[in-house]
């Protein structure tokens, strides 16, 4: 009996010793040879690690490189100089990633990790990139027109919209991001049935990046795919006075809107929903025959007043293949009047853009 107990104890000690030796070997390999442990492929998933070091950092240098344009930063990718013990190309790449939202992960053979540098009053993250990878990164940036992260594409389109135009290729890239595809998954085809993908993109761009990425973060994309989450997202855009959000709520969630929305939110849906849409007309008919029909009567009185103005100032949603010349010819309105009414400084249009059409002169 004592022999068996002693044998079991020896086996436990042996297994523990082997485990500790393997751990020390991995740490030795990583520290002495400065290699990444996940290169050994011992783990099923990516091992993202950050290291931290205290160094001297000049705030003037950091401020100067932070204000550099993307073209200036990319030009530094060929620079072989060192600043504060680090290649200046690494400093430039860190700014390109953090400030200009450049995405280089498609050309990397391993997950992107960072080293945190701590100065007396500042902190800085430098990417752990092998200097041999910079030619590949340069080729990638030259060959791709929009090598940005999802947020970078969002901010770029947001800037274009403010200028009155959007590049369709950039819009296509944004609509292919995991965040936007998650939003479309939540809608279960409602965006296509009731409107268009371009109109949906226009809505989320107009309401800002903070709201969009709050709802479409990585945690939500993996665990929050439900009707409740869809209603929560659309309700948020409804609070932004978005007509499309009101319409999308009526495609799959009209029962929730009719029976569970408070009076204030229901009135908002009625006020914002496009009157000409079959979904709106069907919902309004159901509302008139429901216990909440008094809201239909109140909203009808409020909607009638703007319709007089609509006859004078019509709106048109740009479709695929439209041009200013075709729209002007279709509605019998001079092109210069449309340009003046919408404050355009060019003739480029993208699907989903809403044009205000001036009243026809008799």
UniProtKB/Swiss-Prot annotation:
Keywords: Membrane, Transmembrane, Transmembrane helix. The chain crosses the membrane at residues 13-33. It is a single-pass membrane protein. Belongs to the chlamydial CPn_0593/CT_474/TC_0759 family. CDD domains: LysM. It is found in: Membrane. The keyword Lipoprotein does not apply. Its main location: membrane. Residues 314-357 form the LysM domain. This is Uncharacterized protein CPn_0593/CP_0155/CPj0593/CpB0616. GO terms for cellular component: membrane. InterPro entries: LysM_dom (IPR018392), LysM_dom_sf (IPR036779). Gene3D superfamilies: LysM domain (3.10.350.10).
